[in-house]
Amino acid sequence: MINFTIHGSCAGTSPIPGARHTSYCMEVNGSVYWIDAGENCAYSAHLNGVDLLATRAIFITHPHMDHIGGLGNLFWNIRKLTYVYKDEGMARMEGKTLSLRISELRSWHGIYEMLCCTEGDFGINFTIDAAPVMDGEIFRDENMVVTAHHNSHLIPKTEGDWKSYSFVIHADGKKIVCCGDIRDYAEIGDVYEGADLIFVETGHHKVDAVCNFFLEKGYNFGKLVFVHNGRRVIDNYEESLETAKSLVGDRVIISRDGMKFSL
């Protein structure tokens, strides 16, 4: 079973009560894997019962602030809890490697420099393996395989230097597609076929248009999960959900902060 928790369901809008910037995680066999790290993601996760010390990897779709604004604080909280839990925390994290996949390593270098100016110079007893995202397989462990597929949400300044990616995750016999921010749902090909969950966004799209895209293409899929939602959806939640269900039936979730579900 894969357990999902939504830490932030909001697009990069100005602050909206009860809706933080985009972040969610998957728990597989006791390990935690993150998709994006928007503001306050560690705070939300911890208070929602997610074990931060079980973090194995963090996958960033692209380096906009609404997707990385909480990244430094996430690592800070992991270190903090390592000490709060004393001997148990130290033992759990000793020699552990946390993987970070992010297309713009400059962002990570800046965040790390900031962390090194905090308590104890950010001395840690675990390793952070930061590597760039590129097309193809970017991560593999005993629980999952993750492949990246570039999209044109961010246009490269240099040919081929893509900074925005969608992810396909195979875990526990399931297929999950995380679109991230995307200009055109068609641009990453037929990766959606056979997916059990497809995380889609309405920060740049309308609910009915997204649903109709998948219906018209005829993809076989389990459920659409709307994250990175704009004000139109957040302010009109029930109406948006009704619209989606009128098109795809019960095969839809419009996420809210703190929401949990399993696959």
Residue ranges, per PLM feature:
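Core dinuclear metal-dependent hydrolase active-site scaffold
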Residues: 1-50, 128-187, 257-263
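Active-site neighborhood of phospho(di)ester-bond hydrolases with catalytic His/Asp-centered motifs
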Residues: 34-38, 55-63, 103, 176-180, ...
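Active-site metal-binding motif and surrounding structural segment of the metallo-beta-lactamase
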Residues: 40-96, 194
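Structured loop/turn residues at beta-strand edges in well-structured enzyme cores
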Residues: 50-53, 96, 124-126, 142-144, ...
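A short alpha->loop->secondary-structure connector
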Residues: 53, 82, 117-129
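Extended hydrophobic secondary-structure segments that form protein cores and membrane-embedded regions
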Residues: 60, 90-105, 129-132
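A short helix->loop->beta-strand "cap" motif at the edges of active sites that frequently abuts
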Residues: 81, 87-90, 94-98, 217-224, ...
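Binuclear metal-ion centers of metallo-dependent hydrolases, dominated by the metallo-beta-lactamase
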Residues: 185-197, 205-263
